[in-house]
Amino acid sequence: MSASILLCDGFDVRRILTGKLNGDESSTVTTEEDDEAVFSGEEWCGESSYCFYFVKQFAYDDPEIKAKIDEADHEVYHCNTDRIHIANRLKSKRAARLSLVASMETLMSMKINEVEKEQEVVRGRIYRLGERLSEIKMEIELLDVQMACVLNQRDKAVERIKFLRMQRDKGNAAFYQSRVVMKKAIELAASGNVRDLEELADSEVEKFMSRWNNDKAFRDNYKKRILPSVNERKLRCDVQIRDLEGNLDTENGNETVVKKAIEYKRFSTEEESDDFDIPVYEKLGKEEKEIDEETLKEKKREEQLEKARLAMERKRKLHEKAAAKAVIRVKKEAEKKRKELDKRAKKKKAVCKSSSVDVDRTTETVSEASKPEKEKLLNGRSVFPKQRSYNYRYHGKGNDAVLKAIIKRRKAYRLWVWTVSSAAVALPLALLVVFYYVR
């Protein structure tokens, strides 16, 4: 079988040759690799060959879709690099956070002496570590937000690439279908089934011609697909071999080919108005719309990132304010505790001094009070002394125990006075009674 590409009546055609030798019933197939082989005339004299033509469909890579796929692929690459960079930063920040937490735990678990200087140093270190830890937490939260945005952007780009590839494959459905047909034709040619091969070729050509005659969009699409192969083989758009003596310039590319194609003859007088209508302005309009949509998407994404950044700044400021308030509160509480401790120490000192003075005073008053009572009893004065009015001084909360002791001692003194006076009265009465009965 020989698979060679020919151009006939404006269509890109693939020719399949198959044949049999007179002396051999098995089919023989020649391929493109065998074209360079040298055969003798005796081998080819008895061969009967058949030639079938199939319309070849080309795969068309739309430049717009290709540009979009390249752009999305570039965006995915940038997103992956940003993700790796953010992941490395997150790893370092988390390691720093763990080290700070460990150092704070060691400081908290230390057995601190009661010396105030050491406590102040440790508190200052804990405060500085807490500030650094809060800053690292804010940075980690910001990096997490950036990571989520990057991953979301990458996922959208991947979905866009999948959609564009599906769109490209959908546009090249005719190409994949023609590949299946050509594979089947090659198999039939290899097996020597000429009848089925002829039926297949006729049916495919009829299908193509019916669509060519009835569908203008199909004609335009096929012309667009065939242009690259025509330009590569230096053929005209009416599919005739270029005139070597002509003044046609092939250096200008597809634009010169499309412009000069209008000057040549059309395939038929009915299709003169349908040939090579290239909607340049429509393409430009579509491109502008797509560019506007892309710019809007980029603006929305930038706005979202800006909003996230502002929100993180607000949170950071609130955390800083809360940390400053907490520090001020801790300082005030520490000052209050220090003042209370100082007051308690002063009160203890005052209580100790006042208790010693009161004990001395009570001993002196008891000794002084016992002397005049004895003198009064000896002089025969009144047994019941006058009660003296004592002016008690107000003492603080720490002198309650001392006051109770003084009151108890005074009560004991009064009882002792009452017993002595009653005994002094009872003795003379008893003596009188005894003398009366004795007489």
UniProtKB/Swiss-Prot annotation:
Belongs to the plant Proton pump-interactor protein family. It comes from Arabidopsis thaliana (Mouse-ear cress). GO terms for cellular component: endoplasmic reticulum membrane; plasma membrane. Keywords: Cell membrane, Coiled coil, Endoplasmic reticulum, Membrane, Transmembrane, Transmembrane helix. One of its GO terms (biological process) is regulation of proton transport. This is Proton pump-interactor 4. The chain crosses the membrane at residues 415-435. PANTHER family: PROTON PUMP-INTERACTOR 2-RELATED, RNA-BINDING PROTEIN YLMH-RELATED. The keyword Transmembrane applies. It is a single-pass membrane protein. It is found in: Cell membrane; Endoplasmic reticulum membrane. The keyword Endoplasmic reticulum applies. May regulate plasma membrane ATPase activity. It comes from the Eukaryota. Residues 286-354 form a coiled coil.
